[in-house]
C-alpha cells in the first residue's frame, strides 16, 4: 500500500515538474499547432528547410550558417 502511494506521488510530481520546466509554458499546444499550420502554408518558414553555406564560402558569425562545423569568416 505504501509503495503504491509513493509511486503515485512520484508520477504526479514528475508530471508537474515536466509541465513547470517546459520551454514554452504559455499557449503550449495552441501555439504549437498554429506554428505547424503556418509551416504547412509556407514551407520556407520551416526550420528544417534552413539553407547552409558550402565549404569555403563567407559565413555569418552570428547565425552560424555553415553546413559543416562552426563559422569563422569562412566555412570549414
UniProtKB/Swiss-Prot annotation:
Keywords: Disulfide bond, Ion channel impairing toxin, Knottin, Secreted, Signal, Toxin. Expressed by the venom duct. Is not hydroxylated. Transmembrane segments: none annotated. PROSITE patterns: OMEGA_CONOTOXIN. Residues 1-22 form the signal peptide. One of its GO terms (cellular component) is extracellular region. Disulfide bonds join 52-67, 59-71, 66-75. The cysteine framework is VI/VII (C-C-CC-C-C). Probable toxin that inhibits ion channels. Belongs to the conotoxin O1 superfamily. This is Conotoxin Am6.3. It comes from Conus amadis (Amadis cone).
